[in-house]
Curated annotation (Swiss-Prot):
<dbReference type="InterPro" id="IPR009080">
    <property type="entry name" value="tRNAsynth_Ia_anticodon-bd"/>
</dbReference>
<keyword id="KW-0436">Ligase</keyword>
<keyword id="KW-0067">ATP-binding</keyword>
<dbReference type="InterPro" id="IPR001278">
    <property type="entry name" value="Arg-tRNA-ligase"/>
</dbReference>
<keyword id="KW-0547">Nucleotide-binding</keyword>
<dbReference type="GO" id="GO:0005524">
    <property type="term" value="F:ATP binding"/>
</dbReference>
<dbReference type="InterPro" id="IPR001412">
    <property type="entry name" value="aa-tRNA-synth_I_CS"/>
</dbReference>
<dbReference type="GO" id="GO:0004814">
    <property type="term" value="F:arginine-tRNA ligase activity"/>
</dbReference>
<dbReference type="InterPro" id="IPR036695">
    <property type="entry name" value="Arg-tRNA-synth_N_sf"/>
</dbReference>
<dbReference type="InterPro" id="IPR005148">
    <property type="entry name" value="Arg-tRNA-synth_N"/>
</dbReference>
<dbReference type="InterPro" id="IPR008909">
    <property type="entry name" value="DALR_anticod-bd"/>
</dbReference>
<keyword id="KW-0030">Aminoacyl-tRNA synthetase</keyword>
<dbReference type="InterPro" id="IPR035684">
    <property type="entry name" value="ArgRS_core"/>
</dbReference>
<dbReference type="Pfam" id="PF03485">
    <property type="entry name" value="Arg_tRNA_synt_N"/>
</dbReference>
<dbReference type="GO" id="GO:0005737">
    <property type="term" value="C:cytoplasm"/>
</dbReference>
<feature type="short sequence motif" description="'HIGH' region">
    <location>
        <begin position="128"/>
        <end position="138"/>
    </location>
</feature>
<dbReference type="InterPro" id="IPR014729">
    <property type="entry name" value="Rossmann-like_a/b/a_fold"/>
</dbReference>
Amino acid sequence: MKEHLWNLIADALSSLQQEGILSSWNKDKIQVQRTRDKSHGDFASNISMVLAKEARQKPQKLADLIVARLPEHPWVKKVDIAGPGFINFTLALPAFQAVVSQVLEQKESFGRCRTGHGKTVHLEFVSANPTGPLHVGHGRGAAYGDALARLLTAVGYQVHREYYVNDAGRQMDILAVSVWLRYLELCGETLPFPSNGYQGEYVRNIARSLKAGEEDLPHHSATEILAGLPADAPTGDREKYLDALIQKIKNLLGKNSYQKVFEQALNTILAGIREDLAKFGVTYDAWFSERHLTEMGAIEIAIERLKAAGHLYQKAGAWWFYATNFGDEKDRVVIRENGQPTYFASDIAYHLSKLEQGYHKIIDIWGADHHGYIPRIKASLQALGADLQQLDIQLVQFAILYRGKEKIQMSTRSGEFVTLRELCQEVGKDAARFFYVMRGAEQHMDFDLELAKSQSNENPVYYVQYAHARICSVFRQLKTREFVWNSEQGREHLGKLNEAHEVTLLDRLSCYSEVVESAAIQSAPHLLAYYLLDLARDFHTYYNAHTFLVDIPELRDARLALIAATRQVIKNGLTLLGVSAPESM
């Protein structure tokens, strides 16, 4: 619909240009939007206000000139000029009825467009450290990122999905040490577990598999391991204790044996993450290893570029980045006193490699706890001369899980958390994914487990899926009633769809393509979730007020065409959110 109105306005502007009233006009300036108030028509354009200065006309006068030159169209019932020069369009009912035919003809393709055609997007999301299973907090980032990828693809962008595997650095060493200590316990040793180690049952499971598969690992006593270490918390510094313990175990095991423990821990957890995401309906084009940055020399190259440009300085044996020169609150260490790069150095190299691959846009989806990290990343890239317009860092608030009225506390380090796998087993993938995207990513959300499991109209995903299943049920009744749906005849008699509930449903269907485009461009999958709830509500109201399988063939076929189109749009929308559309419930 918007495209038809856009073309009408373009024709009018071309006429004004030919008459010399407009010297030129840019097609990108033509904007047509749905009105929020139906008393102002169905669509409105502010084009006369945009071009008034260029045309040397008052906006209202230019609006008069544009309206006078609009070609006639059977879908346009009335055109008004309102306020300072808005051009309001009221559409005739056939304009909305025509949407039914479009849906039935285009099927799965309905709602897709070419807005992003020829443009590429690099989308990195989830990227949880492989130090434990994915928990429900990661689930929201997964649902949001995957839905955004699907939406961007639907509007024409070529999307590259990537998971950045943080498989280097201190956290991975803490995991490896935690596994090794549990391994020693299985071998009969008794020793204190570090207060800041990883304590979940999954660590014990990795240790068990390590013991079952590796008989040649060296064995060291608790006395040998603990000798010479500083005190742990509460009497000592837990971080200094951990660092000393890591180095001690590396020395005792040697490079090869330590690497076996490290790889066993990494590969076990990473395999679980891959499996959980696949079951959640999330796939990636690439899993990018942080260690690969070191192997390819990317970190060293990035650091040398910063040094050469004068953006690094030495202090206390470490190399620091002048982040404050680029808007950050303080300078940041990139190379530690021991010569090892920091996580920040790896992230600089990773982002630089992404930017240099030529994508039109780089989107990072991070947990909200990383908000303080944004200024330093942007500062480093600005120092390297990168175009920050390419980079879009989006934050996702973690979901707060409730069981009844009780808030569930979670901590990966202590092992007290609900995994994404457990959540899906309890409420199902569909409920989890829909609930996760029902709020804007930047908004806090409370995840009600009991509501997500309920089969009632209060459960949003059930309500939407039930609308789809209900429509499927109507079509199954055709055979029982000895009716046959004549789709072609239904489309020929769409003019019979003039009841109030039908007009409401037609109007809602006509919005779908615009909602998909807006949800993609604004990075707002929740707009589509809201739309599907509204569409389901309109259908359920229609279902309760009217009989579809009436004896009049033309009316029956037209109504069946309408609900068939509704079914298709619900399925299309749910698919973009990664949710199934069941045919029976």
